[in-house]
């Protein structure tokens, strides 16, 4: 075995940094990540400038949720290799994930100044511009990044034959975050961008298709195009585009709100020209809305471009702060508990089964797990842990049965539901679609109770993919 050979060679030549680097890479490929981490540090002890060791170390730290350490490793990479477009691009991506978008933008631009063909830097800029509501600039960067590469192939690190997964996505926001879901020791991933791929061209070889286009409000045209592409395959499809297409906020409000023991707020989508050129307040009132109400831009998540309008007179100012060509109005439902806190639950559904992901508790109406009062409040984490341990017991039989009806109605192989409970124990649905992210918890020990539930979800997705992929093989 090559690993044994390298360890013997390093005994004879302990300063051989390239052999030490090869050993670290093999350990990583075998999934022995703790040993790989230590091995990369050993490479850097021998050669502090080693590009591959710095980069791979940062990737490992990122995958472990050690964001601060990963940022430090990438910072060293850029300092020691200032003329590397790859170094600047990787550093920028982690900066963006850390919410430092101005710094990320500067490093993406530096990468493109070094090498204008760096596709991933264009992709990163597109994401930043999109987050800021500048869709014209975002579209320009996407086209620069994707036009010549509509299909990319991931590295397979396993042994034997992989399960080949064709992932359908779009050039920008609206995709299901899949980074944590695929194991490159089991699956070989081909990622295809709908909209840049010739529909008459044969699809890349695959055993199963994972439709990662998850946002029906933002990606209706792409979902329709994906449906047409799938006419060229007989392989099983995870999340058929037709099923995703009917999960927009307005459509969900109507069909889920009709279910027993499910409450959905009123939703309506308005073109901006209607609200900007007429009296917005009158248009909203004519559609049955009062104040307070919520306004959000379609296609954005995690609280972006999502605001509460307290009174009728605040409407024009609120609208002026939002980008985009359309706005969704949402009736505000006050779901505060008796203690004054808002509680938002999230479940993930995989192959029809319900998995609890988190319970966020916050004084703020706009509840998001990692922005909620979870770090400072151990009693909130205790509630979260209780939900993860026994979701049916926490939600109650009435609410859990309503969740099962929601999951059956969605008919998604992979998706999620964000919801609260009203005083009668009914489910109040905020969002139900395929875009829900399953994020491994940070490395801090206070989140240890969350690791097993997250691992169970990821394992369920991988099991579903493997089973569907193997089912399509001959014999």
Can you annotate each of these PLM segments?
Residues 29, 63-64, 97-98, 131:
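Register position in tetratricopeptide repeats
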Residues 151-161, 169-275:
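Conserved N-proximal alpha/beta basic substrate-recognition cap immediately N-terminal to
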Residues 256-260, 265, 283-305, 324-339:
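ATP-grasp fold ATP-binding core
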Residues 306-402, 406:
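Phosphate-binding site of ATP-dependent enzymes
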Residues 408-412, 421-475:
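C-terminal active-site "lid" helix and adjoining low-complexity regulatory extension at the edge
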